[in-house]
């Protein structure tokens, strides 16, 4: 092997290259100036991200900037709370919590044509990453309502429920219904699928959808529908979206090897973009209900699932 010092230098150079590429991939958008809201509020969750809002003293930091902090407590109807705040005169809505919270606050902001600020106080903060918000500067994100610029981005929805990142069906959606897998990454769940759920055919549910060529397809382990298109694969930048204003849904379908090996050749993984997408699903319960993971939150919806994009809604 090489000299330890040479190895250290190579590792250091490799790390700098990766960092440089990541910075190059980070959205760098020069934003037009926007008038600051006069009565902004910040919804914050003390438990999100291991307590980031508390660690960074976000309520006090918000008050210093003229932003009213409103704590989201367990059992609170977030949408009803937001509607009440808007009725009372709130003219800007910020969300300091996970992506599920971001989606609800963003939806209400869009409905009332109010400015929205994403505060990266969740665990992964995927929406913040793709917006170009510095996830390491939690407090600095509050300045969006002080001297920030305006950026218009898309939202997406499934059966009337808004999402900012993605909606998952199949194995991942089944997993997030379970406490032990909540918050786990998709690749972790896939790696332990057989152990957790049994044979692969037990998690290949009867989904039917229209493929990119217009044909009806069925049989999938995972269907992922996203607000705009993710970079896929294992390279640097994978799992991020270069644009949030393309006005499309990204669709990615993963099949089990058993499904793909029967009949005509079928790729294990396929991806494309559309503006509308529909999935018919027969769950084992046969009651028309479908387990869905919406921005990481476990939900149950009624089939068929109708996905649409809302270009420039936020």
Region locations from a protein language model:
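N-terminal glycine-rich "phosphate-gripper" loop used for MgATP/nucleotide binding
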Residues: 95-99
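Short glycine/serine/threonine-rich phosphate/pyrophosphate-binding segments
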Residues: 100-105, 126-127
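Short acidic/glycine-rich loop or secondary-structure boundary segments that cap or lie
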Residues: 172-175, 216-219, 231-235, 259-262
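Alpha-helical membrane-targeting segments
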Residues: 182-201, 235-237, 250-271
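Active-site beta-loop-alpha substructure in enzyme catalytic cores
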Residues: 220-255
């Amino acid at each position: 092997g090489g000299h330890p010092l040479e190895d250290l230098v190579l590792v250091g150079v490799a790390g700098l290259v990766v960092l440089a590429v990541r910075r190059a991939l980070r959205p760098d958008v020069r934003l037009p100036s926007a008038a600051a809201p006069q009565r902004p509020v910040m919804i914050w969750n003390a438990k999100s991200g291991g307590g980031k809002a508390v660690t960074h003293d976000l309520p006090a930091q918000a008050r210093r900037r003229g932003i009213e902090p409103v704590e989201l407590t367990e059992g609170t109807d977030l949408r009803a709370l937001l509607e009440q705040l808007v009725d009372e005169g709130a003219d800007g809505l910020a969300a300091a919590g996970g992506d599920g919270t971001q989606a609800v606050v963003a939806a209400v902001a869009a409905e009332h044509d109010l400015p929205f600020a994403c505060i990266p106080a969740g665990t992964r903060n995927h929406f913040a990453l793709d917006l170009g918000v510095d996830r390491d500067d939690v407090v600095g994100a509050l300045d969006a309502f002080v001297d920030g610029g305006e950026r218009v981005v898309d939202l997406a929805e499934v059966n009337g429920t808004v999402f900012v990142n993605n909606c998952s069906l199949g194995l991942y959606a089944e997993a997030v219904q379970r406490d032990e897998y909540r918050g786990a990454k998709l690749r972790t769940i896939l790696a332990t699928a057989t152990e957790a759920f049994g044979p692969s055919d037990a998690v290949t549910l009867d989904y039917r959808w229209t493929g990119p060529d217009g044909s009806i397809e069925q049989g999938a382990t995972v269907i992922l529908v996203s607000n705009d298109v993710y970079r896929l694969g294992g390279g640097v930048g994978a799992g991020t979206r270069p644009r949030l204003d393309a006005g499309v849904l990204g669709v990615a379908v993963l099949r089990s090897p058993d499904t793909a090996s029967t009949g005509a050749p079928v790729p294990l993984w396929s991806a494309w973009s559309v503006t509308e997408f529909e999935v018919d699903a027969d769950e084992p319960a046969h009651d028309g209900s479908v387990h869905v993971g919406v921005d990481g939150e476990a939900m149950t919806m009624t089939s068929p699932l109708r996905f649409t994009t809302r270009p420039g809604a936020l």
